[in-house]
């Protein structure tokens, strides 16, 4: 991921000496982010990759401080948080392809924060339609040939992933796509239905069933997030009536990736 950021945006990530910058857990690694062109300081990146007792599940990105200049230059403090499993007994740490794509996804959010430049932090921000685009688009680089040849190697032989296997993985990307699309889209539509009610429903389960019935939801497919555990909607207002942005972002990131591929260089800095 750091290699990708360097090629696309000219960022360097340098480990900060242990203990020189406070972290919120011993597992957290801190990196200083600088511009390759002039060595100027961009911010700090906190990498919290491993699961532990008391840590919430899933993966997420956090911006503790955004860039601003209204009261002197304030640089970015950003973190990525994953739940990878630590290896035991000196074994190498292995992650799945899905984990690797998640890592690049969350790193895209961090790159978005690190690239932002505005005077007043209160006037910064991202339209909900766009907020998942910077994360989802960076997932495409996981299977790019330079990343595969440099980093995605067999743990025992050191050989990079063969292109024949990459082709099969990419071909499998459309498997069950109809199911996945309906699962995602039903969650987005029920979200919109819920947030356009003049009177909030008191029986959320009954509302969900009625909403899905109006949509003609196939019985064989379930929502990606049932309403009782739809954290995107209820842990904050961030995604209220906005869960559709994940699907809309897929449209934008597919178009972007096609543009990179058509240029003949998926690390084309002029496009980035």
Predicted regions: what is each one?
Residues 1-272:
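Cation-handling catalytic/transport regions enriched in His/Asp/Glu
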């Amino acid at each position: 991921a750091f290699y990708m950021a360097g090629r696309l945006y000219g960022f360097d990530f340098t480990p900060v000496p242990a203990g020189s910058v406070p972290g919120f857990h011993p597992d957290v690694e801190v990196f200083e982010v600088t511009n390759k062109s002039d060595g100027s300081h961009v911010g700090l990146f906190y990498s919290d990759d491993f699961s532990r007792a008391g840590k919430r599940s899933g993966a997420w990105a956090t911006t503790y401080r955004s860039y601003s200049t209204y009261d002197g230059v304030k640089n970015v403090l950003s973190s990525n948080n994953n739940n990878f499993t630590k290896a035991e007994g000196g074994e190498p740490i292995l992650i799945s392809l899905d984990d690797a794509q998640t890592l690049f996804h969350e790193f895209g959010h961090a790159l978005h924060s690190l690239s932002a430049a505005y005077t007043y932090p209160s006037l910064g921000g991202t339209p909900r339609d766009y907020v998942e685009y910077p994360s989802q688009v960076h997932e495409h680089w996981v299977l790019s040939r330079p990343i595969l040849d440099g980093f995605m190697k067999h743990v025992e032989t050191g050989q990079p992933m063969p292109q024949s296997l990459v082709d099969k993985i990419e071909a499998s990307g459309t498997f069950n796509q109809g199911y996945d699309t309906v699962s995602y889209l039903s969650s987005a539509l029920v979200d919109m239905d819920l947030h356009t009610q003049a009177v909030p429903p008191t029986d959320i389960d009954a509302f969900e069933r009625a909403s899905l019935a109006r949509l003609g939801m196939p019985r064989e497919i379930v929502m990606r997030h049932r309403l009782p555990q739809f954290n995107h909607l209820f842990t904050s207002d961030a995604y209220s009536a906005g869960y559709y942005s994940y699907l809309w972002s897929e449209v934008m990131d597919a178009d972007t990736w096609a543009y990179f591929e058509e240029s003949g260089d998926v690390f084309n800095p002029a496009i980035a």
